[in-house]
Amino acid sequence: MSDNANREGRRAIVLLSGGLDSMVSGGIAREQGFALAALTIDYNQRHRVELEAAKRVAAALGVDRHVTLPLNLRAFGGSSLTDDIDVPKDGVMPGIPSTYVPARNTIFLSLALGFAEATGARDIFLGVNALDYSGYPDCRPEFIAAFQHLADLATKMGVEGQGFTIHAPLQHMTKADIAQEAARLGLDAGMSWSCYDPTPDGKHCGLCDSCRLRSKGFADAGLADPTVYA
């Protein structure tokens, strides 16, 4: 029996931001036979337009339960996405940029883990990537492996031997690979959102790290970019 057959109908939680990476991660989970629930975090981010994109993507993926959880990380600040700090637009630079949100993926994965255990799901998918990315420390394979260990230690299901699997299927893909994977899965990349600093009329700015990586990914993949840039 194939792995997909074994997974048929088994529930997975998809951390869904509304971005291209999380959409493709969810598409891979669906292709593998999982029944999908999605968790989107409304953390009072600058680019709140991604929350509407998450709704569109969830519907396209056939998610049967989509929870949008409010969590005001602007109360902490410390990031261009949650504070009055300009979003860098000088290209992808070495080091960790100001768009890094302190401990964001640790927080989000912890919430997804709680959602998973509460609903009996044992699989969590997220779209982190450690190749074409902005250098965030919580996107690295070492972080995912460490959180996997934490999940098994810190939960009732984990200590009872049922365990969880943290899936990061895009971990070692380039942005071009991800764009091609979206096309292969039949996903409409145009419904996703990547920009950190949207224009007042609802366009991608075209200059932030996330826009640059997205645009380059489609170009390198030889695919038409459906994104509307300013």
Curated annotation (Swiss-Prot):
Protein name: 7-cyano-7-deazaguanine synthase
Free-text comment on the cofactor: Binds 1 zinc ion per subunit.
EC nos: 6.3.4.20
Family: Belongs to the QueC family.
Keywords assigned by UniProt, alphabetized: ATP-binding, Ligase, Metal-binding, Nucleotide-binding, Queuosine biosynthesis, Zinc
Residues the entry annotates as binding Zn(2+): C195, C205, C208, C211
Pfam families hit by this protein: QueC
Function noted in UniProt: Catalyzes the ATP-dependent conversion of 7-carboxy-7-deazaguanine (CDG) to 7-cyano-7-deazaguanine (preQ(0)).
GO MF annotations, alphabetized: ATP binding; ligase activity, forming carbon-nitrogen bonds; zinc ion binding
Cofactor(s) essential for the protein: Zn(2+)
PANTHER family, sorted: 7-CYANO-7-DEAZAGUANINE SYNTHASE (PTHR42914:SF1)
Reaction(s) this enzyme catalyzes, per UniProt: 7-carboxy-7-deazaguanine + NH4(+) + ATP = 7-cyano-7-deazaguanine + ADP + phosphate + H2O + H(+)
Pathway: Purine metabolism; 7-cyano-7-deazaguanine biosynthesis
Matching Gene3D superfamilies: HUPs
List of residues binding ATP: L16, S17, G18, G19, L20, D21, S22, M23, V24, S25, G26
GO-annotated biological processes: queuosine biosynthetic process
InterPro entries named in the record: QueC, Rossmann-like_a/b/a_fold
Originating organism: Rhizorhabdus wittichii (strain DSM 6014 / CCUG 31198 / JCM 15750 / NBRC 105917 / EY 4224 / RW1) (Sphingomonas wittichii)
